């Protein structure tokens, strides 16, 4: 950001509390020009503190911002400390800035992630500077129609020097385990075939291998063509043609065991004696 601001080489911005109030905050509230425009103007209370460094104009371990002072009530003096997914909480006593005359007030705040009053304390710190002894009934800036204490100057830093991020527990995405998915009462799978597993001692780790349902269907398909041919031949050898069965003078059923047609399907049953009964009309 230094190149964009055209800052001189070796420039460092480490102002004291009094310098921040006298040369920056007072001039901002009075709409006067600031010699080194290195402080960004944002609505600080709309963001989490770890999002602010990217919005700053300058800074490495601490960042400075002008922010409108958001109040809980339009005509009141109590500020609204809600910010981002958490809130800022004041800590310690206010510190007067300026001697012999007090120009501003410094307040220290700590960011808590989550909803008040059960938020999680973080390492993000804010020093908020506001003007002191402001007559709220008559102190209206004619150029921007803001009260003189409507602007605050904020210094943001992490006391551990890290970019820690915190999120409320109820906003963390829930991870569904494999066990929960398998126990779901609704099966959203497109496949309607059951998965078959067989033990395979040769596989590594002793895991079974999956048999495809398509393979099972081909292997279990009966040979209907061969079976029909065998039944037709068996029927013809036992009873002959349909014309022979219609002869009125003689009916000679022959029960012959035909084993040749069933050898490819099952083991033949025990052989029984050959039966040949002939019935002739009595004279």
Swiss-Prot record:
GO CC annotation terms, alphabetical: nucleus
Induction (record text): Induced by wounding, salicylic acid (SA), methyl jasmonate, drought stress, dark and sucrose starvation. Induced by chitin elicitor (chitooctaose). Induced by salicylic acid and infection with tobamovirus (TMV). By indole-3-acetonitrile, salicylic acid (SA), sodium nitroprusside (SNP), salt stress and drought stress. Down-regulated by brassinosteroid (BR) and transition from dark to white light.
InterPro entries: NAC-dom, NAC_dom_sf
Comp. bias intervals (Polar residues): 175-195
Compartments, as annotated in UniProt: Nucleus
Role this protein plays: Involved in disease resistance response. May function as repressor of pathogenesis-related proteins. May function in the regulation of host basal defense responses against viral infection. Transcriptional activator involved in responses to wounding and infection with tobamovirus (TMV). Binds to the DNA sequences 5'-AAAATATCT-3' and 5'AGATTTTT-3' of CYP734A1/BAS1 and CYP72C1/SOB7 promoters, respectively. Acts as a suppressor of the brassinosteroid (BR)-inactivating enzymes CYP734A1/BAS1 and CYP72C1/SOB7, and prevents their expression in almost all tissues.
Comment, domains: The NAC domain includes a DNA-binding domain and a dimerization domain.
Protein name: Protein ATAF2
Taxonomic source organism: Arabidopsis thaliana
Classification lineage: Eukaryota, Viridiplantae, Streptophyta, Embryophyta, Tracheophyta
């Amino acid at each position: 950001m230094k190149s964009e601001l055209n800052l001189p080489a070796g420039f460092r911005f480490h102002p004291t509390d009094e310098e921040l109030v006298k040369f920056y905050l007072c001039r901002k509230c009075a709409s006067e020009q600031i010699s080194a425009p290195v402080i960004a103007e944002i609505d600080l209370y709309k963001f989490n503190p770890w999002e602010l460094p990217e919005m700053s104009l300058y800074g490495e371990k601490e960042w400075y911002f002008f922010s409108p002072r958001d109040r809980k009530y339009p005509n009141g003096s109590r500020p609204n400390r809600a910010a981002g997914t958490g809130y800022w909480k004041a800590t310690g006593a206010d510190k007067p800035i300026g001697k012999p005359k007090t120009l501003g007030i410094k307040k220290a705040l700590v960011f808590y992630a989550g909803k008040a009053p059960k938020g999680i304390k973080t390492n993000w710190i804010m020093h908020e500077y506001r003007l002191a002894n402001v007559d709220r009934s008559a102190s209206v800036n004619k150029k921007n129609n803001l009260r003189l204490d409507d602007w605050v100057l904020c210094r943001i830093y992490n006391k551990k020097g890290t970019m820690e991020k915190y999120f409320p527990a109820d906003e963390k995405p829930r991870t569904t385990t494999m066990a929960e998915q398998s126990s779901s009462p609704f099966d959203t799978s497109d496949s309607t075939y059951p998965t078959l597993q067989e033990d395979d001692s040769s596989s590594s780790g002793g895991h079974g291998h999956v048999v495809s349902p398509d393979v099972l269907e081909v292997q279990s398909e009966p040979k209907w063509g061969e079976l029909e041919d065998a039944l037709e031949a068996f029927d013809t050898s036992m009873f002959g043609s349909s014309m022979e069965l219609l002869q009125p003078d003689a009916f000679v059923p022959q029960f012959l065991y035909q084993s040749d047609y069933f050898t490819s399907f099952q083991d033949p049953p025990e052989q029984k004696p050959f039966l040949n009964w002939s019935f002739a009309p009595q004279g």
